[in-house]
Amino acid sequence: MSLDINQIALHQLIKRDEQNLELVLRDSLLEPTTTVVEMVAELHRVYSAKNKAYGLFSEESELAQALRLQRQGEEDFLAFSRAATGRLRDELAKYPFADGGIVLFCHYRYLAVEYLLVTVLNNLSSMRVNENLDINPTHYLDINHADIVARIDLTEWETNPQSTRYLTFLKGRVGRKVADFFMDFLGASEGLNAKAQNRGLLQAVDDFTAEAQLDKAERQNVRQQVYSYCNEQLQAGEEIELESLSKELSGVSEVSFSEFTAEKGYELEESFPADRSTLRQLTKYAGSGGGLTINFDAMLLGERIFWDPATDTLTIKGTPPNLRDQLQRRTSGGK
């Protein structure tokens, strides 16, 4: 992995009681040892693989102002990180769910792009087996489950300040409040809505195939083409390029897909991040609620699965063997 660490700082927040978060600040930067580089590379890999929200700094953002001064050489990276950790502590203290953790600031370069990664990591206890096959206690940073993470694309921020996607963050698994306090700390608001862009793409694809008067099989083939392209981009960590997708769909209609979306006013960006859960709807129908979970391939609708919108009834012809076996055993009184 072509990742180079410029500067990295580590601090700690310790929750002493319900009211107080103690600040423990390092007096020096971390040395970019092999172990440190491997840790940052793992953070980069894990973060890049997750669905993210996009944002931009507000004009009043204290973090953005401090970062700008640091980038201009008016403040060193350690002082910047120490002051920012203090602001983070102040924001966290407003929320009853606030816990401590290891606060990490890392300025690094990956594939000619400069980033600032900010995260709060849990330092967890575990066990390890040593060379004598004895079991000893150990601690580790829970990188795989980190949900308080933000990354600023410094290259994008400085070369294209009008961008709505230079800042990315995770919304967190424990609810909206995690995103709220972190956005307050960053002094940021949501920017590009990747889910909305992906939903708009799906609607445009359906309308495009309808206007081209394709039959059901042809429509599904187009949806599969779109899914394959988007999934490849997702796996490669690349964005969906509207013009590239349009070339994939050449021959479907006399009008190109990119021309169609522009003429119909779908307001799709020239490129935008792929959203895995939204794109899955291209090839599958899925839903759950009221104790019922249903998931099936889109091509089965109208063939083995039929929906009557008037009665909101779904009819399935031919159940999966394992489900059929369970039903037969239950209805016959078996266990």
From Swiss-Prot:
Pfam families cross-referenced by the UniProt entry: NA37 (PF04245)
Gene Ontology CC annotation, any one: bacterial nucleoid
First and last residue of the signal peptide: none
Broad class of where this protein is predominantly found: cytoplasm
Claim: Cytoplasm is one of the keywords in the record: yes
Alphabetized InterPro entries for the sequence: Nucleoid_associated_NdpA
Source taxon at top rank: Bacteria
Cell compartment(s), UniProt: Cytoplasm, Nucleoid
Coiled coil: none
NCBIfam families: PRK00378.1
Family, as annotated: Belongs to the YejK family.
Entry protein name: Nucleoid-associated protein YejK
